[in-house]
Design a protein with these regions (language model features):
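Acetyl-CoA-dependent GNAT
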Residues: 3, 7-81, 92-98, 117, ...
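Conserved active-site tyrosine of GNAT-family acetyltransferases
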Residues: 121-122, 126
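Residues forming the Rossmann-fold NAD(P)(H) cofactor-binding site
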Residues: 89
Length: 149
């Protein structure tokens, strides 16, 4: 089944917050971090947010930010029933294409060190380039539009 991205709006904030808290709560507890609804809401308001859909079903979301050199994936979460079905790989492909189309030099993200999604990111071409406490910083050079990632 095909996946699509649809622009998210403020009406999707509660879904995204709940999904992120559910998906990341284990890591917050593992690393003794404090979850903040207000912090999530503030971050959501300052980012470009996309819903991940499969046919007419909302299955996840991706949240982005940018600087002059890079497109950053700030959040990428899927509902439990839709994980390991190719959506994450598809979203990463879309984000590589977006970064190239915007002439960004890099696609970057951070991931909890114990999050198995790190393997997906590595399979898709991102490499660990540093660490910050409990996070790996990962990136991939985004080649020109004429290149095939």
């Amino acid at each position: 089944m095909a996946f699509t991205l649809k622009a998210a709006s403020d009406q999707h904030l509660a879904f995204a917050r709940s999904l992120t808290h559910q998906a990341m709560g284990h890591y917050y507890r593992q690393y003794d971090l404090t979850w903040s609804d207000k912090g999530f809401d503030t971050a959501w308001a300052g980012r470009e947010n996309w819903l991940i859909c499969q046919e007419d079903k909302l299955v996840g979301f991706v949240s982005l930010s940018r600087d002059d050199n890079a497109l950053y994936i700030r959040e990428l979460h899927m509902l439990e029933d839709f994980r390991r079905q190719g959506a994450g790989s598809w979203v990463l492909e879309q984000m590589f294409a977006k970064a190239r189309a915007e002439s960004r030099g890099y696609l970057r993200l951070t991931v909890f060190k114990t999050n198995p999604a790190k393997r997906l990111y590595q399979r898709q071409g991102l490499s660990i380039v540093g660490e910050e406490g409990c996070f790996w910083r990962m990136e991939s050079v985004c080649l020109s539009a004429q290149s095939s990632r």
